[in-house]
Amino acid sequence: MDSLKKIVAYKAVDEYVQSNMTIGLGTGSTVFYVLERIDNLLKSGKLKDVVCIPTSIDTELKARKLGIPLTTLEKHSNIDITIDGTDEIDLNLNLIKGRGGALVREKLVASSSSLFIIIGDESKLCTNGLGMTGAVPIEILTFGYEKIIENLLKIYTLKGCTYKIRKRNGEIFITDNKNYIVDFFFTEPIQDLLETCTRIKMTTGVVDHGIFVNMTNVALISKHDGTVLTLNKKYE
């Protein structure tokens, strides 16, 4: 599986990253190979004068260890390209992200990018709709979190869901933004994606959710035979 992650990450960097770019760095195991490839190209001199914006403390630490030049969204608000992984992707390039806990920063950096590229292996591709392979995360305030969840359960598309407050090592997981994550589990593919997103986001106390709709420009999907499938956003 790691070999598939490496193939698709290297291809994304080689095909889309150029010198003098501001680059958004996603979070997760596949993105590690993006860092590795950027580092290789910088050290070889094939890539020059780039700065990168990490979407999590974890990515920041890994990038610093490699010596990759970093900046902030405050200093570089217009990002040329962001490369990130995903938990699920449908054929319209809509996503479920955030099972690693960095969904808010990932979404903010992606929305600030001219080009948002998703990478992953074919196990992430969901041809029958989103929400069926695992948690759909929602980041919420710690204050009044039980009331926030109560209000979320009133949303018609969430009524049949089960949920869990995310924990790590037996303790409630705290995001880089000092919030909680509540993971919702669907029994059928999410209906009315846009309406569901709107209602979740409008719930007081919700910071953001892991449903990314109409944000991805290109998806690179590595297949088990070592080839890479390229999916492009459809423009109407």
Swiss-Prot record:
SUPFAM superfamilies recorded: D-ribose-5-phosphate isomerase (RpiA), lid domain, NagB/RpiA/CoA transferase-like
Keyword Isomerase: yes
GO MF annotations, alphabetized: ribose-5-phosphate isomerase activity
Name this polypeptide is given: Ribose-5-phosphate isomerase
Catalytic activity: aldehydo-D-ribose 5-phosphate = D-ribulose 5-phosphate
Lineage: Eukaryota, Sar, Alveolata, Apicomplexa, Aconoidasida
Binding residues annotated for substrate, in chain numbering: T27, G28, S29, T30, D84, G85, T86, D87, K97, G98, R99, G100, K124
Biological function: Involved in the first step of the non-oxidative branch of the pentose phosphate pathway. It catalyzes the reversible conversion of ribose-5-phosphate to ribulose 5-phosphate.
GO BP term, pick one: pentose-phosphate shunt, non-oxidative branch
Organism listed in the record: Plasmodium falciparum (isolate 3D7)
Transmembrane stretches, start-end: none
Pfam families: Rib_5-P_isom_A
